[in-house]
C-alpha cells in the first residue's frame, strides 16, 4: 500500500509501505480522511518521533474492510473512527479506568503504524462506529471532539454558568460547542485570529474577544459584571493564555488546562496569590478516555454528530490535500502563522 512515511526529521514521503495484516481481535480500516494534529508537527519537524521510519496519524475515519477472528460487533462496510490510545489494561491505572494514565500504553500513529496510509489495522475495541450519513472529514474530527469533552468532564462542568474558551483552534471550538450543548449561561471565546473568532461565533459563542486589542481584559470583565468566569478552559497551550486563565477566573471557578505548552511556563507570586485568593479549582486534562473503554467521550461524540447538535463547519478545515502531497502539507507548519485551522489529508 501507499503511506506517508517519516524516514527522518523533515523527511516525510509518500512511499510504499507494508500493508498491515489483520490479527485476532482487530479490524482493517480503509482510511478515507485523516487530520494533522498539532502533536504530529514536532514529530515531523522537530525530532519528536519515537523512532524511524514511522507512519504517523491518529485522527481518522474510514470503512472496515476486514474483520479479525473473534470480532463480533463490527462488520465489513461499517464506518468507523479510531480511538488511538492502546492501553495495556493491566496496570493499576487501567484497572481503575484511568486509561489515559496507562504506564505501558501504545498509541496508533506514534508508537505503532497510524492513519497516514491507505489502510490501518486497529484493535476492535478502538473502532468507534458512527452513522454513515456523517461525512468522512467530519468523522475524522472524532478525536479532537473527545479531547474537548474530556476536559469538561475533568472540570466537573454542569452548565448554567459563564464560560471562557481560551483559544479557538479545533479543540477550542469543540470545547465551546460542548459547553453550549450542556447548558452554558454565556460563552465568550478568546483568540488573536479574527477568522477563528468568526468561526467561534458561528458555532455558538455569545461573544468573542480578540486579545491583541489593548482593552480586551476590560471588556472581558464587563461581560461578567467584573465577577470573572465560572468556568475557564485553556485550549491553546500557550503560556500567555495559561496565565490569562488565572486573571479571568471567578472566585471558586473551575479552570481546566486542555492545551499542552511547548515552552516554559513561569508562574509569578502574583499569579499564585491570584489562585489562592480566588480559591479556584485548577485541573489538567489528558487525552480523552473513560470506562468502559474508550469511554463516554466517544459515545457522546457519535451521538451528537448524528443529531447535528455537535456541528461541523467548513471553517474547521484550513487546507485539504491528497495524502500524496503530505510533504507539502507539513511544510506549511515551518511557519505556523500560515496555518489557520485543521489540515486534512484524504485518500482517493
Label every PLM stretch briefly.
Residues 134-214, 218:
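Mid-domain Rossmann-like dinucleotide-binding core that forms the NAD(H)/NADP(H) cofactor-binding site
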Residues 20-34, 47-92, 131-134:
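Glycine-rich beta-strand-centered segment in the early N-terminal region that forms part
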Residues 7, 18-19, 51-57, 75, ...:
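Short Gly/Pro-enriched turn/cap motifs at secondary-structure boundaries
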Residues 88-166:
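NAD(P)H dinucleotide-binding glycine-rich loop of Rossmann-like/cofactor-binding domains
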Residues 155-158, 203-281:
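Glycine-rich cofactor phosphate-binding loops and adjacent beta1-alpha1 units
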Residues 117, 192-199, 266-271:
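Short, glycine/polar-rich helix-capping loops at beta-to-alpha or helix-loop-helix junctions
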Residues 1-3, 243-247, 296-348:
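C-terminal hydrophobic helical "lid"/dimerization subdomain
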Residues 221-222, 226, 265-317, 328:
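C-terminal substrate-binding/catalytic core of Rossmann-like NAD(P)-dependent dehydrogenases/reductases
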Amino acid at each position: 500500500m501507499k503511506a506517508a512515511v517519516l524516514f527522518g526529521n523533515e523527511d516525510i514521503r509518500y512511499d510504499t509501505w507494508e500493508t498491515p495484516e489483520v490479527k485476532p481481535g482487530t479490524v482493517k480500516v480503509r482510511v478515507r480522511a485523516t487530520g494533522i494534529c498539532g502533536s504530529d508537527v514536532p514529530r515531523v519537524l522537530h525530532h519528536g518521533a519515537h523512532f524511524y521510519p514511522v507512519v504517523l496519524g491518529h485522527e481518522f475515519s474510514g470503512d472496515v474492510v476486514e474483520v479479525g477472528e473473534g470480532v463480533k460487533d463490527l462488520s465489513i462496510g461499517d464506518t468507523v473512527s479510531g480511538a488511538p490510545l492502546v492501553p495495556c489494561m493491566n496496570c493499576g491505572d487501567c484497572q481503575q479506568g484511568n486509561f489515559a494514565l496507562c504506564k505501558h500504553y501504545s498509541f496508533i500513529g506514534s508508537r505503532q503504524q497510524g492513519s497516514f496510509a491507505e489502510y490501518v489495522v486497529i484493535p476492535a475495541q478502538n473502532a468507534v462506529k458512527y452513522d454513515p450519513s456523517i461525512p468522512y472529514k467530519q468523522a475524522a474530527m472524532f478525536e479532537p471532539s473527545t479531547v474537548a469533552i474530556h476536559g469538561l468532564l475533568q472540570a466537573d462542568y454542569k452548565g448554567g454558568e459563564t464560560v471562557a474558551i481560551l483559544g479557538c483552534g479545533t479543540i477550542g471550538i469543540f470545547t465551546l460547542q460542548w459547553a453550549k450543548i450542556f447548558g452554558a449561561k454565556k460563552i465568550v471565546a478568546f483568540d488573536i485570529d479574527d477568522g477563528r473568532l468568526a468561526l467561534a461565533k458561528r458555532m455558538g459563542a455569545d461573544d468573542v474577544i480578540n486579545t491583541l486589542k489593548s482593552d480586551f481584559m476590560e471588556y472581558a470583565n464587563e461581560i461578567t459584571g467584573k465577577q470573572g468566569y465560572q468556568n475557564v478552559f485553556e485550549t491553546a497551550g500557550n503560556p500567555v493564555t495559561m496565565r490569562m486563565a488565572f486573571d479571568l477566573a471567578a472566585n471558586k471557578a473551575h479552570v481546566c488546562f486542555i492545551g499542552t505548552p511547548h515552552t516554559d511556563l513561569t508562574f509569578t507570586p502574583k499569579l499564585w496569590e491570584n489562585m489562592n485568593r480566588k480559591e479556584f479549582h485548577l485541573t489538567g486534562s489528558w487525552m480523552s478516555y473513560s470506562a468502559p473503554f474508550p469511554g463516554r467521550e466517544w459515545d457522546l461524540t457519535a451521538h451528537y454528530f448524528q443529531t447535528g447538535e455537535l456541528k461541523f463547519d467548513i471553517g474547521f478545515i484550513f487546507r485539504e490535500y491528497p495524502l500524496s502531497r503530505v510533504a507539502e502539507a507539513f511544510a506549511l507548519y515551518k511557519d505556523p502563522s500560515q496555518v489557520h485551522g485543521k489540515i486534512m489529508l484524504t485518500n482517493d
